[in-house]
Amino acid sequence: MNKEFIKSIVVSSPWEKVEIARHKDRPTGKYYIDNIFKDFIEFHGDRLFGDDKAVIGGIASFEDISVTVIAITKGANTNENIERNFGMPNPEGYRKALRLMKQAEKFNRPVICFIDTPGAFCGVGAEERGQGSAIANNLFELSRLKTPIISIVIGEGGSGGALALTVADKILMLENAVYSILSPEGFASILWKDSKRVKEAANVMKITAQDLNEFGIIDTVIKEPRGGAHKNPQKQVTLIKKELMNAMNEMKNIETNQMINERYDKFRKIGTLE
């Protein structure tokens, strides 16, 4: 990633970025599917329990390339947020996503994921249906999937709920998105027993796209319109399409075994210190 570009990004505090990432008008995963791809056909269900509306997935066309596209999505209003469980998937959502990814592998389609979730749903029903095993199985299967995977964090990337769709060859992240093991509120409550220290927690956690790019956890920071993606959603679509095409071009000539080995090495290196 170009260091001068990173420096040119409008500087906001980590907590300000959290607030922008959570903004009620921020474009959703569904919005990006509708505006970036053509001929989207949605598939439903995990073939085990039901259809989780927090996860949208199907096949589509991107620049005349057939792709599988999956999004963990919030709603654009209160009613949609209730329908989509505020972007918190149940186990059947992760199993649906994996079903579509395995189908993409079978038909040699690249997989493109959009991530916007505060985390996996932690209700009793979700736990009874195997939330932990659903996420763990995704991590395992994505690590060896024989087709390119590109994941884009567009808002909140919360904990294992986000990681379940970000074991990818290329991880892109919007300028004001955040990606972390838990929320700043949760971090402050656990570490300091004081949920009011959220701004301090956000600083300590290194959750911004710029920090994560510097650490090598993500590959590309996608610039946003001044003030955030919600200020000019169509401009944001254009910026995402450009970086998505760049990522796909980088992946198209990589041999399958090399791709899987590089994906494995990418995640094994996370957390190493020089």
UniProtKB/Swiss-Prot annotation:
**Known Gene3D superfamilies for this protein?**
2-enoyl-CoA Hydratase, Chain A, domain 1
Q: Which reaction does it catalyse?
A: N(6)-carboxybiotinyl-L-lysyl-[protein] + acetyl-CoA = N(6)-biotinyl-L-lysyl-[protein] + malonyl-CoA
Question: In this entry, which stretches build a coiled coil?
Answer: none
Keywords annotated in UniProt: ATP-binding, Cytoplasm, Fatty acid biosynthesis, Fatty acid metabolism, Lipid biosynthesis, Lipid metabolism, Nucleotide-binding, Transferase
Q: Does the keyword Nucleotide-binding apply?
A: yes
Give GO terms: molecular function aspect only.
acetyl-CoA carboxylase activity; ATP binding; carboxyl- or carbamoyltransferase activity
Which pathway does UniProt place it in? Answer: Lipid metabolism; malonyl-CoA biosynthesis; malonyl-CoA from acetyl-CoA: step 1/1
Q: Which InterPro entries match?
A: Acetyl_CoA_COase_a_su, ClpP/crotonase-like_dom_sf, COA_CT_C
Q: Which residues form the CoA carboxyltransferase C-terminal domain?
A: 2-250
Family matches, as Pfam families: ACCA
A GO cellular component annotated for this chain's UniProt record is:
acetyl-CoA carboxylase complex
As recorded in UniProt, its EC number(s) are 2.1.3.15
Q: Which domain of life is it from?
A: Bacteria
**Subunit info?**
Acetyl-CoA carboxylase is a heterohexamer composed of biotin carboxyl carrier protein (AccB), biotin carboxylase (AccC) and two subunits each of ACCase subunit alpha (AccA) and ACCase subunit beta (AccD).
PANTHER family from the UniProt entry: ACETYL-COENZYME A CARBOXYLASE CARBOXYL TRANSFERASE SUBUNIT ALPHA, ACETYL-COENZYME A CARBOXYLASE CARBOXYL TRANSFERASE SUBUNIT ALPHA, CHLOROPLASTIC
Q: Which family does it belong to?
A: Belongs to the AccA family.
Q: What is the name listed in the Swiss-Prot or TrEMBL entry for this protein? A: Acetyl-coenzyme A carboxylase carboxyl transferase subunit alpha
